[in-house]
Amino acid sequence: MKYPPSLVGLIRELSRLPGIGPKSAQRLAFYLFEQPREDIERLAGAILEAKRDLHTCPVCFNITDAERCDVCSDPTRDQSVICVVEEPGDVIAIERSGEYRGLYHVLHGALSPMNGVGPDRLQIRPLLPRVQDGMEVILATGTTVEGDATALYLQRLLEPLGAVVSRIAYGLPVGGALEYADEVTLGRALSGRRRVSEPASPPPPRRNDEEQDGAPARPPSH
């Protein structure tokens, strides 16, 4: 038995959603078919309204319906620290922990060469002008292979800018995504973050060859 074309199309579109395979898409399609028409229209309206009203914050690239997101617009936030995350959902998860009062930067993904996701596909370039000498940057990407690779790439970019770079780690399972962690675990992960670099120190003053060999420097000739 073949499904009607409209049902096939619905299953196909649902299966394009993250985490939804063909079987789950089929179950969702049958579920939606059984719902009252007004419920389906309300769902469709909510999707269209969100698509119309939401956009990314021009500063941190979190999702907002205002000119700038709530965090970037809040003058009481700690301006000396930026927490870098993969997705907007990670911001919500960290905010629920109540352990962080700094700023954010959302990359909208992680480096994944196998899937064709390079640095140019992420919001990495806009992060660099935000980082000032002596600021702390918390790399709160996931503990997946892609998240670790992204953190290492960012560390190498940020160290020459004089940033104190730290990595969220404690309490997060390997391969875990931040948005699925509970508030207590995230709070401990933020509190237990470890520094992976320090601000670059200026090079020592150069000495002439004789001083370097241990011989006293010659007095200046007249």
UniProtKB/Swiss-Prot annotation:
Q: Where is this region: Disordered?
A: 189-222
What functional role does this protein have?
May play a role in DNA repair. It seems to be involved in an RecBC-independent recombinational process of DNA repair. It may act with RecF and RecO.
Task: Answer whether the UniProt record assigns the keyword DNA repair to this protein.
Answer: yes
Domain Toprim: residue ranges: 80-173
Gene source species: Deinococcus geothermalis (strain DSM 11300 / CIP 105573 / AG-3a)
- ZnF start-end (C4-type): 57-72
Tell me which Gene Ontology terms the entry assigns under biological process.
DNA recombination; DNA repair
Q: Which SMART domains does this chain map to?
A: HhH1, TOPRIM
Protein name according to UniProt:
Recombination protein RecR
Q: Which family does it belong to?
A: Belongs to the RecR family.
Q: Which GO terms describe its molecular function?
A: DNA binding; zinc ion binding
- Domain of life of the organism in this record? Bacteria
Q: What keywords are assigned to this protein?
A: DNA damage, DNA recombination, DNA repair, Metal-binding, Zinc, Zinc-finger
Q: Which CDD domains match?
A: TOPRIM_recR (cd01025)
Q: Does the record bear DNA repair in its keywords?
A: yes
Chain ranges passing through the membrane:
none
Tell me any Pfam family this protein matches: RecR_HhH
